[in-house]
Amino acid sequence: MTLKLYDTMTRAKRDFVPSDPERVTMYVCGPTVYNYAHIGNFRPVVVFDLLFRVLRALYGEDHVLYAANVTDVDDKINRKAAEEGVPIGVVAERYLAAYNADARALGALAPTFQPKVTETMDAIVGMIGRLVDNGAAYAAEGHVLFSTEAFPDYGKLSGRPLEDLIAGARVDVAPYKKDPRDFVLWKPSKPGEPEWESPWGPGRPGWHIECSAMIEEALGLPIDIHGGGIDLVFPHHENELAQGVCAAHPHGHGQTYARYWLHNGFLNMAEEKMSKSVGNVALAHDLLKTWPGEALRWALLSGQYRQPLEWTDTLIEQAKSALDRLYRVLDDAARPGDAAAEPFVDPRVEAALHDDLNTPAAMAALFQISDELRSAIMRKDAAAVAEGRGRLVGSANLMGFLAQAPQAWFQSGADEDLKARVEDLLAQRQAARAAKDWPRADQIRAELAALNVEVMDGPSGATWRIKEQA
């Protein structure tokens, strides 16, 4: 089954054909680590994690290389460090650790590589040097700038005509720029800011060159897939493309920088893009204190990835209910002593995901599989139940769902005090049943029901779960 992906460059859905099926490469722009990331920052994380999983299923886990960078040199990091009176590295490492913890809680696999700007400085300086040597960059007043005239296809990725590109440049154009569209590759550091040595004087890199250098060092150029949010198409990815090609080839002609460009839509709140500058944000760090990460992942994938998605409490509640439904049928299908079913992916789920990651269709297929499994349970068809369990688990696992035991899922809504109370009541109930004190056993079951706890008795003992909300 052919994987089809929508390519921003061609404005069309294309069959995915990697340069080398034995070495499939993908790069996605990662975080600037100056604060806790909001849930909108994690939409690309979850979307491209899904693509990473699909690629690994297609080509093999050892044949897919995924790099997601970390920007740990930035004015916002500098300001945060100055406010706290600590080195910038302390701020960057703190929020990188929090970001990675949130990503894992959302079910995102760790990327193969997570390069940092501070650890790629030699490669950055080297790439700028090649651009200067190729006549695609020039030094001016301590800065080094990319000359957009060196790349004839500048504007092709974003589809913007020349006049729009010029109008989109800063109103106050620096006097040392030859063209308003030219952008900074290297700049002098201000007093108190971190700086690195370079042939053009001490300073630090511009934003765009960082990604190109990290891609080249981690994966090599060209890569198969370059991903990120739709807001990065221009200027960031447009500039990456221009400098990446020109660093490798004089006159801006030659190999492709990335074979496919993929971009996810905004996550909106109150019909505006979620943004710290606007103030309409929900931190993933805070949401994870209230909601299971798997439910947040479902919510993030509930819409087609290229379209905007409105983030609301209702969206999360619906995601939690959807997973409750799947976990419940999986729990009901489990019988002590049943043979473990080998997980496998249902063709309906595979077809949906291979159609440009059509997650709404894939989720609908999961519900169809769930209903079929429920029917097999009602018929008491052991073979069909075992097969259905394997089908549901394998299909959901490909999407990063049903990653835990049903009992763990249903108990995740209980705090430690409630868990201790339930376990104590179950122990009392077991003792009452052993003593044939049936009135007491029934009384305890009623107490558990009042706690919104459902008890399931089986040959291996009693298990419990939080009741599904009506």
From Swiss-Prot:
EC number(s) recorded for this UniProt protein: 6.1.1.16
Cell location: Cytoplasm
EC category: ligase
The reaction(s) this protein catalyses: tRNA(Cys) + L-cysteine + ATP = L-cysteinyl-tRNA(Cys) + AMP + diphosphate
Biological process terms in GO annotation: cysteinyl-tRNA aminoacylation
InterPro entries, alphabetized: Cys-tRNA-ligase, Cys-tRNA-synt_Ia_DALR, Cys-tRNA/MSH_ligase, CysS_C, Rossmann-like_a/b/a_fold, tRNA-synt_1_cat_dom, tRNAsynth_Ia_anticodon-bd
Binding residue positions for ATP: K276
Renumbered ranges of motif 'HIGH' region: 31-41
Assembly: Monomer.
Name assigned to this protein: Cysteine--tRNA ligase
Species of origin: Phenylobacterium zucineum (strain HLK1)
